Regions:
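Family-specific functional microsites
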Residues: 1-216
Length: 216
């Protein structure tokens, strides 16, 4: 996959807009209405469900454990004097679930690095290179082991039903004009919001105040 496609996919992860079944229903409801998760066949395939689906649990546990092993090996490499990792291992980020009040491993998949993690790592090492390596490892493993497999299955299933890219484009082109306008406005709003977030972070403004203004 080209670097530009990788960057685009990482942005879609960050804003939870990878093409899940629920996301595809927004553009192709006639095609995907009634479809469930392609892995378990039981639940709606939302962004969170892709990673927390019971069919993916063993894979995600393996990726999580390997991530911890990689992180510990990097810490030992950069600082062999560390002897107690309990504070790091007790963080909620190693939980395989979603939580509106706490960061979990699903948030690491999105690309977020929680402050509580950086605060602990900062006590031991210069953390930038470690964070970059850990983020990339999580991205590559979840992409290859979960997302690519899921997409390959969907493509084969759609092909068996005669659903082609041309058919999707035909259906999408017949969306009501008002829906197209609303979709364009929504996309423009999202990009404006992302630019505002970036500027608030870059220039040290109050991010909480920004969110309050954005949602008021």
């Amino acid at each position: 996959m080209s670097s530009s496609k990788v960057k685009a996919h990482k942005v879609h992860l960050l804003i939870e807009e990878i093409p899940t079944i629920e996301q595809m229903k927004k553009s192709f409801l006639d095609l995907y209405d009634g479809w469930k998760c392609p892995s378990c066949g039981l639940e709606d395939e939302t962004f969170d469900h892709v990673w927390t689906c019971d069919e993916h649990r063993s894979l995600l546990l393996k990726i999580k454990n390997n991530t911890i092993d990689l992180l510990l090996s990097l810490l030992i490499e950069y600082n062999p004097d560390i002897t107690d990792y309990s504070a790091l291992l007790m963080l909620n980020i190693w939980t395989i679930s979603t939580d509106p009040d706490n960061f979990t491993f699903v948030d690491l998949i999105k690309g977020f690095i929680p402050l509580e993690l950086t605060q602990i790592l900062n006590l031991w090492i210069q953390l930038l290179l470690v964070i970059i390596e850990i983020r990339q490892y999580i991205y590559e493993q979840t992409f290859k082991e979960i997302w690519i497999r899921r997409c390959s299955f969907i493509k084969e299933f759609e092909r068996s039903l005669g659903i082609t890219k041309k058919k999707k484009l035909t259906l999408k082109n017949f969306r009501p004009f008002n829906n197209i306008l609303n979709s364009d406005r929504e996309l423009e709003y999202k990009f404006d919001a992302l630019d505002s977030i970036r500027n608030n972070i870059y220039f040290g403004k109050n991010i909480i105040e920004f969110y309050s203004n954005l949602t008021s």
